[in-house]
Amino acid sequence: MSSPDAGYASDDQSQTQSALPAVMAGLGPCPWAESLSPIGDMKVKGEAPANSGAPAGAAGRAKGESRIRRPMNAFMVWAKDERKRLAQQNPDLHNAELSKMLGKSWKALTLAEKRPFVEEAERLRVQHMQDHPNYKYRPRRRKQVKRLKRVEGGFLHGLAEPQAAALGPEGGRVAMDGLGLQFPEQGFPAGPPLLPPHMGGHYRDCQSLGAPPLDGYPLPTPDTSPLDGVDPDPAFFAAPMPGDCPAAGTYSYAQVSDYAGPPEPPAGPMHPRLGPEPAGPSIPGLLAPPSALHVYYGAMGSPGAGGGRGFQMQPQHQHQHQHQHHPPGPGQPSPPPEALPCRDGTDPSQPAELLGEVDRTEFEQYLHFVCKPEMGLPYQGHDSGVNLPDSHGAISSVVSDASSAVYYCNYPDV
């Protein structure tokens, strides 16, 4: 069944073909006029195979003549006729199977049976040397198609890894689900935020005071943490000593007085006994940062202080000076309050105000306070019978102020 427009299409085509030579004749001889006509198109198509076939055959013959084959060895001489015989006997076998059978048969032959073929191969080799004295064996290069296939395979394999990485978290979620592991949600870290090693223990110790746990909460904003700008000196975030930050409950001095401390150290040049004391050091000397000897022996018990005995509240005073030695810089944010040890909050630049706030009635009570045995200081109980003269009023006031600062730190509700 033909379409109704078929006749029209054929008429238009015939009219165009008949009008084309007239138009070309009016235009005159043009180099491209013959190619536009159907006759010229047929001529070009007919001449192309003829012209292309002749050079192709000549090039093939020249290529075949330029390529020199290697002389056959003894096995090739024997297999040339034997392959034809096996192919006639087994027409259905593949050439690879025939090659396997020929190899087994050649190995099964004895040297006497191989000798005529070896002699024939030697003759062909000598003849080949005479015919082609400058012959040099050049092995064939592998086809570029195989090499391109290998390259494309490796290229596609290399592209598979970026595609797998481009899957994003969804691909990771599928992989984690397949392994039976839990995939973390976006926007939250997979684990608790890391803290410096010298701060992790202090946070864990101070959580017993009732502060909320800090390890499970991420930062609310992408800004830097306030802890990043703090001086990482361990002296600033020193581990709390036993008694600096009590866990809970009220602190009673009766329990401290019942504590059986270590025996009193022997008398010597470094640990003198009780005796007449010289005039005490000045107030700026007590409020200044302690030296190495002051830290170990105390301001009153060090050899440089006159050889006097050390009083009991000196460890607290040393601890306060250590915290005052590393204040946060002006551009650094203050650390969280629960991360700080108990600070006295006193300013050494105002000794007059400190002396005015001291209650002299509390001084004798704090003198009987037991010192820490781990600090290596002399141990004095409440029954040691220590009597200080009234001439040491300034020293007593400073010590009492330091003790009251520690006392009010231990009692935040007072």
Curated annotation (Swiss-Prot):
Entry's Gene Ontology BP terms: angiogenesis; cardiac cell fate determination; cardiogenic plate morphogenesis; cell migration involved in gastrulation; cellular response to leukemia inhibitory factor; common bile duct development; embryonic foregut morphogenesis; embryonic heart tube development
Pfam families: HMG_box, Sox17_18_mid
Positions with biased composition (Low complexity): 47-61
Keyword Nucleus belongs to the record: yes
Motif 9aaTAD in this chain: 361-369
GO cellular component, one term: nucleus
Tissue expression summary: Expressed in adult heart, lung, spleen, testis, ovary, placenta, fetal lung, and kidney. In normal gastrointestinal tract, it is preferentially expressed in esophagus, stomach and small intestine than in colon and rectum.
DNA-binding region: 68-136
Annotated ranges, domain Sox C-terminal: 280-413
Chief site of localization: nucleus
Molecular-function annotations in GO: beta-catenin binding; DNA-binding transcription activator activity, RNA polymerase II-specific; DNA-binding transcription factor activity, RNA polymerase II-specific; RNA polymerase II cis-regulatory region sequence-specific DNA binding; RNA polymerase II-specific DNA-binding transcription factor binding; transcription cis-regulatory region binding
Localization per Swiss-Prot or TrEMBL: Nucleus
Biased composition (Pro residues): 327-339
Disordered, as annotated region: 1-22, 36-66, 256-286, 305-352
InterPro entries the record matches: HMG_box_dom, HMG_box_dom_sf, Sox7/17/18_central, Sox_C, SRY-related_HMG-box_TF-like
Key word Ligase present: no
Record key words, sorted: Activator, Disease variant, DNA-binding, Nucleus, Transcription, Transcription regulation, Wnt signaling pathway
Subunit and partners: Interacts with CTNNB1, LEF1 and TCF4.
UniProt function note: Acts as a transcription regulator that binds target promoter DNA and bends the DNA. Binds to the sequences 5'-AACAAT-'3 or 5'-AACAAAG-3'. Modulates transcriptional regulation via WNT3A. Inhibits Wnt signaling. Promotes degradation of activated CTNNB1. Plays a key role in the regulation of embryonic development. Required for normal development of the definitive gut endoderm. Required for normal looping of the embryonic heart tube. Plays an important role in embryonic and postnatal vascular development, including development of arteries.
Disease linked to the protein: Vesicoureteral reflux 3: A disease belonging to the group of congenital anomalies of the kidney and urinary tract. It is characterized by the reflux of urine from the bladder into the ureters and sometimes into the kidneys, and is a risk factor for urinary tract infections. Primary disease results from a developmental defect of the ureterovesical junction. In combination with intrarenal reflux, the resulting inflammatory reaction may result in renal injury or scarring, also called reflux nephropathy.
Note on domains (UniProt): The 9aaTAD motif is a transactivation domain present in a large number of yeast and animal transcription factors.
Name of the protein described by the UniProt record: Transcription factor SOX-17
Source species taxonomy: Eukaryota, Metazoa, Chordata, Craniata, Vertebrata
